């Protein structure tokens, strides 16, 4: 075999490896969350954010609570007095999901974002995974807020 042919085969192999990895990368998507959740409770006041989903024994499968802070920064949630296992997605000011965590009922440990977040969406534990909603996807937050008025 000629050296030129071997170089061609080597480049072709690298190209196919590259295509394989690129095709397996998660493509982020823009999500209209109202297509997934029939009820989204919006909490923007301090007292409402502080209480969150405390004391509720159950929440519907297609229910979410959207927390809105007056500033973008590192935000924290906890599960004190919360009966239902939850997942939380921290969302930046542009609507991009930056982190997703599963939270344990009654835990007093804070679950904090490591990046600046403006919003958080709490849902039943495992819901994001079930819906194939991932870090990097974007939620149309402004659309939710416009429909809430």
Residues covered by each model-derived region:
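Hydrophobic h-region of N-terminal signal peptides that target proteins for export
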Residues: 17-27
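Intrinsically disordered, low-complexity cationic segments
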Residues: 3-4, 14, 25
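Sec-dependent signal peptide recognition
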Residues: 7-18
């Amino acid at each position: 075999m000629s050296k030129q042919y071997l170089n061609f085969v080597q480049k072709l192999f690298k190209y196919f490896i590259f295509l394989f990895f690129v095709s397996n990368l998660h493509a982020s998507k823009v999500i209209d969350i109202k297509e997934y959740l029939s009820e989204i409770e919006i909490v923007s006041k301090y007292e409402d954010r502080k209480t969150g989903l405390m004391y509720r024994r159950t929440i519907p499968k297609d229910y979410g609570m959207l927390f809105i802070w007056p500033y973008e920064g590192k935000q924290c949630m906890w599960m004190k007095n919360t009966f239902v296992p939850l997942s939380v997605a921290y969302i930046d000011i542009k609507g991009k999901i930056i982190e997703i965590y599963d939270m344990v009922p009654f835990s007093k440990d804070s679950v904090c974002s490591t990046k600046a977040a403006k919003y958080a969406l709490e849902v039943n534990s495992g819901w994001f995974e079930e819906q194939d909603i991932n870090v990097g996807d974007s939620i149309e937050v402004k659309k939710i807020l416009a429909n809430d008025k």
